[in-house]
Amino acid sequence: MDLSILIPARNEIFLKNTIEDALKNIEANTEIIAVLDEAWAEPRVSQHERVTVIKTPKAIGQRAATNLACKLAKGKYVMKLDAHCSFDKGFDRKMLEFFKEVGDNVTGVPIMRNLWAFDWKCYKCGWKKYQGPTPTCPNCGPEKAHRMHRKMMWVGKHNPQSTSFCFDSEPHFQYFEDWKHREPYLTDKKTKGYTETMSLQGSCFMITRENYWKWEVCDEKAGSWGGQGMEVALATWLSGGQVLVNHKSWYGHMFRTQGQDFSFPYPQSGREVKKTKDYIRNKFWKNQHPTQIHKVSWLLEKFWPIRGWTEKQLQDLKSVGS
């Protein structure tokens, strides 16, 4: 087995679509392991020889669910994916070829597109609205709510194509547009077809199964959910690895940031979010990661300047542990 795709899922209505799209587009010796975190999938995932579905009796969280899937994985490489993604044709083969080129001391991702999963459509008058929380038709009103349904689209949109990410001093995820206009990004994109990124968004990453465990990229003590892109990138870079984006493939990710019934599947209290950020900051800022050989200041200097960081904050970090 070359690649194991790990999909943690809790109340994910597009898990079936995600798995079916992956199966349609894989071209390598790839398996899919989905962990249903307490709740059964609805609609149900169809049986397939390449797909393993596990259900936990109670919710264990996204990190623990991903780790459970990785314990069962048979592939040399593992790819963690959110349960609402679409895929480039041959994305698994292209990523495996990418690792053959760059080596295994890497965490890699394809280009991230935005997934246009569905439109809302009123099947009485034909009114449509782009994906989001369940709307009320302005023409027919709430009394015709039963005529409002999702019309599936499942398109990885061509814009934006996200390839550069960072985090600020909080730490909080940010897109890193400035980096895309500097060297070595410009030359690497043109001559190599892949580029370095300071951090990750977190909906997808690929790594050897050995490094997944060795670099401790999915620490359950960080909390059930959130901050995973930063955690994976920090664990990789500060352990002596590289975080690279392969520009020869892509995946589409559906963003759910509008609340109501179009929000995150795990509880997201401000207290829990802060707890995760504090844990990540204390672990990496204070050089507590078990395989850490670089300070966070080393990573900042590599990508400096970075929006959301001041020169004083950088100098303060450089003095930690010295």
Regions found by a protein language model. Give the residues of each.
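Conserved donor NDP-sugar-binding/catalytic core segment of glycosyltransferases
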Residues: 86, 90-171
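A short, conserved alpha-helix in the catalytic core of glycosyltransferases
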Residues: 95-96, 204-205, 210-216, 222-249
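Glycine-rich, basic loop-to-helix element that forms the pyrophosphate-binding segment
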Residues: 57-72
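Short beta-strand/loop segment that forms part of the nucleotide-sugar
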Residues: 28-40, 52-56
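A recurrent flexible, glycine/aromatic-enriched loop bordering the glycosyltransferase active site
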Residues: 63, 181-206
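N-proximal low-complexity "stem/linker" segments adjacent to membrane-targeting elements
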Residues: 1-21
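Short aromatic/hydrophobic "clamp" motif used to bind/position activated sugar donors
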Residues: 78
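Short, acidic, metal-binding catalytic loop of nucleotide-sugar glycosyltransferases
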Residues: 20-29
